[in-house]
């Protein structure tokens, strides 16, 4: 097996797991260097862990702004959001089973939609995002409720397995096999901004439960307004619906040991953990006549 050196642009828990997996199987001689960056959009970005591991095992490490020129024949990018000027082949790992969920935050949006399978796709980078030929994928069936942190724990080993299989193929044959995507099956996933973390109480309670779980840690968490204050919903669950003659989404209908049960467009949702902007719990809620917006 003829080893080659590759450049790695890695972020997130998935990037860390791939880093450890590649090192474990192939040693540090396959690393030209590793580049990482902090991510202010999420609570936990694994930058320190990636840097520390590289330093511990003597893999050249660079912060994004100090990134050297890429001279390796192949480059692997995981959870990377910036352009990479690679001379050779650029391999991107994407958080969905392409061609579905091309674009941004595919795992988050997959969980919101209650997809029965989640996974990862390795593809050749292209000018149009996520339209390159597929090098391989891995998938797993999931059940709900499922928090985003749990989903990441599930898919991270798939990243490691897929990358190691691709490297074995590359080192054994000198090249990588690919196949075109089926364009008719393509869907797209939009980027998220602050407004995308806000709960729409007009949605049904099943969707709201998945939404809260999908945007939780390491993301910034689902938000709603209560008496002109933004609060963050950390956990909750669907409870059986009742017949409401004058249904109004967002209003509290019951209180269960200080935990408000909120009317949704369809169904009811009980808030079990919630904090204010200072990170302090707002529960048990003392006021009954509350409407979340």
Task: List each language-model region with its residue ranges.
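One-carbon transfer enzymes
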Residues: 1-219, 223, 254-260, 264-270, ...
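A short acidic-to-branched-hydrophobic micro-motif
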Residues: 227-242, 269-277
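A conserved acidic, glycine/proline-rich C-terminal tail/linker
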Residues: 237-260
């Amino acid at each position: 097996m003829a080893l080659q050196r590759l450049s790695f642009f890695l972020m997130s828990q998935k990037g860390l797991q791939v880093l450890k997996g590649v090192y474990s199987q192939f040693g540090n001689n396959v690393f030209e260097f590793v580049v990482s960056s902090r991510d202010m959009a999420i609570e936990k970005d694994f930058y320190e862990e990636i840097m520390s591991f590289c330093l511990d095992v003597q893999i050249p490490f660079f912060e994004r702004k100090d990134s050297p020129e890429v001279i390796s024949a192949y480059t692997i990018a995981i959870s990377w959001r910036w352009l990479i000027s690679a001379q050779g082949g650029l391999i991107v790992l994407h958080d969905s089973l392409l061609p579905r969920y091309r674009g941004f935050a595919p795992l988050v949006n997959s969980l919101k939609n209650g997809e029965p399978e989640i996974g990862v796709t390795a593809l050749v980078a292209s000018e149009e995002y996520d339209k390159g030929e597929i090098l391989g994928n891995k998938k797993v069936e999931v059940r709900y409720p499922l928090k985003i942190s749990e989903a990441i724990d599930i898919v991270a080993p798939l990243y490691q397995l897929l990358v190691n299989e691709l490297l074995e193929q590359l080192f054994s044959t000198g090249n990588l096999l690919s196949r075109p995507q089926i364009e008719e099956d393509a869907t797209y996933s939009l980027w998220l901004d602050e407004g995308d973390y806000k709960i729409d109480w007009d949605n049904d309670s099943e969707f709201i439960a998945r939404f809260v779980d999908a945007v939780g840690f390491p993301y910034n968490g689902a938000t709603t307004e209560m008496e002109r204050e933004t609060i963050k919903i950390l956990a909750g669950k669907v409870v059986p619906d009742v017949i409401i003659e004058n249904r109004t989404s967002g209003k509290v209908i019951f209180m269960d040991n200080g935990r408000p049960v909120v009317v949704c467009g369809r169904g009811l949702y009980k808030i079990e953990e919630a904090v204010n902007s200072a990170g302090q719990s707002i529960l048990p809620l003392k006021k009954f006549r509350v409407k979340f917006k």
